[in-house]
Amino acid sequence: MIHVGLLSKEKCCGCTACYSICTRGAISMKRDEQGFSYPEIDENLCTQCGLCVRTCPSLSPKFYKSIKCFGAKHINKQEQLSSTSGGFAAALSDYVISKGGVVYGVALDDVKYVRTVRINSRADLPKLKGSKYVQTDPCETFRQAGADLKYGLFVAYFGTSCNIDGLRHYLLCKNISTSNLVTIDLICHGVPSPQIFEDYIDYLSKRKPVNNFYFRTKAKGWGFGSKTFSPSVCYSDGENVCDKPITLAYQQLFFSNNCLRPHCYECPYAQMGRAADFTIADFWGISIFHPQYFDKDGVSLVLINSNNALNIFNNLQNIDSFETTTEIAYFKQENQRRPSQKNSAYEQFWKDYHQKGIEYILQPVSYTHLRAHETGRNLV
């Protein structure tokens, strides 16, 4: 293969490692008709050096075995409550900043754009809080993280497994030391289309301007899977709409498995081998195996996949934790064993989206083509 432009869409995870490594500027990331970004090669600039192929994680994914597993929660109740799970990510991020380091994580930009950003102060860490069920745009962060590491900074990078593996491949190809790097991936269901989410926020904004959208809140507490996700939209006039059909609609799209990136249905990272130093998730099943540690305000599952991660974990002062087993950790984590499966209505879903728009595809409960009036549900 002479360049990554020849990869099928099912093989491309959109991590931007190829774009970041190309010194000729021959690669740009362009959205397709589903709203996912893929590398586009300028043949006039490409020298067929092969760097983009060498840095592509999909062609040679790397995995690490978990060496320890923990349940954890932040000792500060407000930090725990404002986090999606137990607040471990917040505790780790604060630790890195306290050491003079920088944190790369996913934030909402102007409500509807999901991007990976660089944070170097405690005051800005709240931007990274909360799940974002959309594929992020890494922007220039691989290059920025590489520059920070070369400068000697302590760097933490949060992302999906494919994103993290792409970063590691990029740094390896650039011969940049990763001794000051700690990576954190997620047990990932799959990444939905950014275009779908942007259209969804535009749809919500027809009612009145949207100030913020929360993919998950703890309005119903935590611990019982998606039934307690309680997504919420905050409008500019202060109105907060939570757990209503209009806010649940995007969550239902996400779990329908119709709007995930094609690569997600064949994801090589949906397995017990991990791509990062830490893997974090909700500790689903804690009430079954560790009822004494259950907390309705959230508990994080933390997989330790390297000695680097174990050393950092042992130095964290702002968490309460308990050790568990891999069997318990994986019990309620289906995507730790297999990728999400493509919905049988997938082709019809995209046809309807392109022909009829976002409002039409938001109506079904699980995309069985039942309209809202047929299910007895109304969006507003």
What is each model feature region?
Residues M1-I2, N44-Y151, E327-I361:
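Flanking helices and flexible, charged tails adjoining ferredoxin-like Fe-S electron-transfer domains
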Residues M1-K9, E40-E43, I246-F255:
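Short, intrinsically disordered, charge-biased short linear motifs at domain edges
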Residues K9-K11, A17-E40, L51-I67, D277-F278:
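Iron-sulfur cluster-binding cysteine motifs and their immediate structural context
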Residues I21, G166-L167, N378:
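Phosphate- and divalent-cation-binding pockets in alpha/beta enzyme and binding domains
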Residues T84-G87, D110, Y157-L167, G190-P192:
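Gly/Ser/Thr-rich loops at beta-strand to alpha-helix junctions
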Residues C173-D185:
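A short alpha->loop->secondary-structure connector
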Residues I184-Q348:
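Catalytic cores of enzyme domains
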Residues T368-G376:
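Conserved small/polar residues in nucleotide/adenosyl-binding loops
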